[in-house]
Amino acid sequence: MFKWPWKADDESGNAEMPWEQALAIPVLAHLSSTEQHKLTQMAARFLQQKRLVALQGLELTPLHQARIAMLFCLPVLELGIEWLDGFHEVLIYPAPFIVDDEWEDDIGLVHNQRVVQSGQSWQQGPVVLNWLDIQDSFDASGFNLVVHEVAHKLDTRNGDRASGVPLIPLREVAGWEHDLHAAMNNIQDEIDLVGESAASIDAYAATDPAECFAVLSEYFFSAPELFAPRFPALWQRFCHFYRQDPLARRRENGLQDEGDRRIVH
């Protein structure tokens, strides 16, 4: 179990969290020992700074809390935990939840409807998740609800709303937008050809630039082999922004055998 000297007087108990057990999930299996240590330190700080609020009778064990914190910190591992400033609570439902959604169509009419959501990220408010999809985010499958919502938070640091362009130098914005829209068009072409269910990238990525950035961030961290060869130029932009290269990391450190990568509950 990791123990941090700088947290010796911490009354929160985060220094005694089951960090090593929390690391035993496929999406984190390729991290080096140095990266694991850094992620653990960052996750401990995350739990100091944020409040995880379990809703509707859900109970979060210390292991659950540790893994949630690690997934939040993975995208900002090299950016710094300050990139997660701007919210103080993470609300967690047991399962996907129903919300009242309001939206305006192309001619200005406002519509209201009840929709099922997996997660939400409010610009100046909490992140909302559900436990069923958080558990699915432990796998290296291309799906990661936590990374998706963190990407939206990072996206909105660049302005009033999520645009698909995170906080990058102004000189890089045009190239980013070009490559992102090219990826959206490519994904839509595949959907038109084979259908949403058979598409190799989640069809949600084709809906708008903000969702494309969030969905591809999921693949960036949990299924880089599906992202990098298909969109090499955009892949390099993601590597530059996140200051990580999950595909190179995976090749350098190697993935453990399936028997060694089982999730410990």
Swiss-Prot record:
Assembly, per entry: Monomer in solution. Interacts with Mlc.
Family, as annotated: Belongs to the MtfA family.
Pfam families: Peptidase_M90
Entries under InterPro entries matching the protein: MetalloPept_cat_dom_sf, MtfA_enterob, MtfA_fam, MtfA_N
Binding-site positions, Zn(2+): H111, H148, H152, E211
Gene3D superfamilies according to UniProt: Collagenase (Catalytic Domain), Glucose-regulated metallo-peptidase M90, N-terminal domain
Natural source organism: Klebsiella pneumoniae subsp. pneumoniae (strain ATCC 700721 / MGH 78578)
Summary of activators and inhibitors of this protein: Association between Mlc and MtfA may induce structural changes that activate the peptidase activity of MtfA while inactivating the DNA-binding ability of Mlc. The aminopeptidase activity is partially inhibited by metal chelators such as EDTA and phenantroline, but not by inhibitors for serine-, aspartyl-, or cysteine-proteases.
Biological-process GO terms, alphabetical: proteolysis
The record's note on its domains: Zinc induces structural changes at the active site. The holoenzyme adopts a self-inhibited conformation and is most likely not productive.
Name of the gene this protein is made from: mtfA
Cofactor section: Zn(2+)
Highest taxon above the source species: Bacteria
GO CC annotations, alphabetized: cytosol
GO terms for MF: aminopeptidase activity; metallopeptidase activity; zinc ion binding
Record's cofactor remark: Binds 1 zinc ion per subunit.
Protein name: Mlc titration factor A
Stored SUPFAM superfamilies: Metalloproteases ('zincins'), catalytic domain (SSF55486)
Keyword Aminoacyl-tRNA synthetase included in the entry's annotation: no
PANTHER family noted in UniProt: MTFA PEPTIDASE, PROTEIN MTFA
Subcellular location: Cytoplasm
Keyword Metal-binding among record annotations: yes
Major localization listed first in the record, in broad terms: cytoplasm
Described purpose of this protein according to its UniProt entry: Involved in the modulation of the activity of the glucose-phosphotransferase system (glucose-PTS). Interacts with the transcriptional repressor Mlc, preventing its interaction with DNA and leading to the modulation of expression of genes regulated by Mlc, including ptsG, which encodes the PTS system glucose-specific EIICB component. Shows zinc-dependent metallopeptidase activity. In vitro, can cleave several artificial substrates. The highest activity is observed for L-alanine fused to 4-nitroanilide (L-alanine-pNA). Shows lower activity towards proline-pNA and valine-pNA.
